[in-house]
Amino acid sequence: MKFRPLHDRILVKRVEEETKTKGGIIIPDTAKEKPIEGKVMAVGNGRLGEDGKLIPLEVKKGDRVLFGKYGGTEVKMDGQEYLIMREDDILGILE
């Protein structure tokens, strides 16, 4: 299924964290934190400025981003879990 976000919304796929600590301890699913890192899968056209002009988004498809633990809205498409969030929910781009 193809999905194109509208306006300043972004489709992000979470990057799963390690299931083992550096010391070799296996972390059970119940103790794992939600990942705050993800890969941008699709972006909208941008947001409208106060003057009515379109302001393009800074993030682009393929960027690795950091976001707040509870950011975005969880959706499921084609058996995969994604987040739909606004550009304001993204804290930064990993380079």
Swiss-Prot record:
GO cellular component, one term: cytoplasm
Keyword Chaperone tagged: yes
Protein's UniProt keywords contain Cytoplasm: yes
GO molecular function: ATP binding; metal ion binding; protein folding chaperone; protein-folding chaperone binding; unfolded protein binding
Pfam families in the record: Cpn10 (PF00166)
Protein's GO biological process: chaperone cofactor-dependent protein refolding
Disulfide bonds: none
Keywords carried by this UniProt record: Chaperone, Cytoplasm
Subcellular location: Cytoplasm
Subunit: Heptamer of 7 subunits arranged in a ring. Interacts with the chaperonin GroEL.
Family membership: Belongs to the GroES chaperonin family.
PANTHER family: 10 KDA HEAT SHOCK PROTEIN, CO-CHAPERONIN GROES
Entry function: Together with the chaperonin GroEL, plays an essential role in assisting protein folding. The GroEL-GroES system forms a nano-cage that allows encapsulation of the non-native substrate proteins and provides a physical environment optimized to promote and accelerate protein folding. GroES binds to the apical surface of the GroEL ring, thereby capping the opening of the GroEL channel.
Name under which the protein is recorded: Co-chaperonin GroES
Upper lineage: Bacteria, Pseudomonadati, Thermodesulfobacteriota, Desulfobacteria, Desulfobacterales
